[in-house]
Amino acid sequence: RYLALFFLVALVMYMVVAIVGAAETIMQGTKESGRLHHREDGQFGVFVPLTDGEIAQITEKGVTLQRDFSMDFHLGQSTLRVYQARENVDLFVSSQGSEVPAQGEILLEQHYAEKHELGLGDTLTVGGRDFTVTGIGSTPDYDAAYEKTSDTTVDSNLFGVGFVTAQNYEALKAGSAPRYA
């Protein structure tokens, strides 16, 4: 009887130590990934773009700003949020293919690509324009790709993120209203 109790206590202790060790590894990995890929320190949204004067007031305080507009496109039952490829903050990390899109190319969040069976070289139509998938990966701000901050679960069947060149973004914007972030 005491031997069984001893083994039960030892097993529970082993499980607790394993869970704590795994959690620490995940936290350190997330922190290191954020540092390597220039994860943002904060984010705010505005209803209209900031004026040059407002930007100057903010940057004088030592803050680096990056405009990060996006547009949501409905592709069947899912929504794809498209951003202009980033240069300084929240950089795209490729697990397959390119880290920087060229003209006519799109980079996709890896779970969205997987759920929609999209791979390198596939064509994806967004906003009436065809794009070739040339990169699949993630960004530190979309480790968990929530469509809204109030979402409680990630569903890559319903929401994903893509990145295109500045020219392609402007062409898409001509037919859509951007969200200011």
Where in this protein do the model-derived segments appear?
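Basic-flanked hydrophobic alpha-helices used for secretion and membrane insertion
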Residues: E24-A181
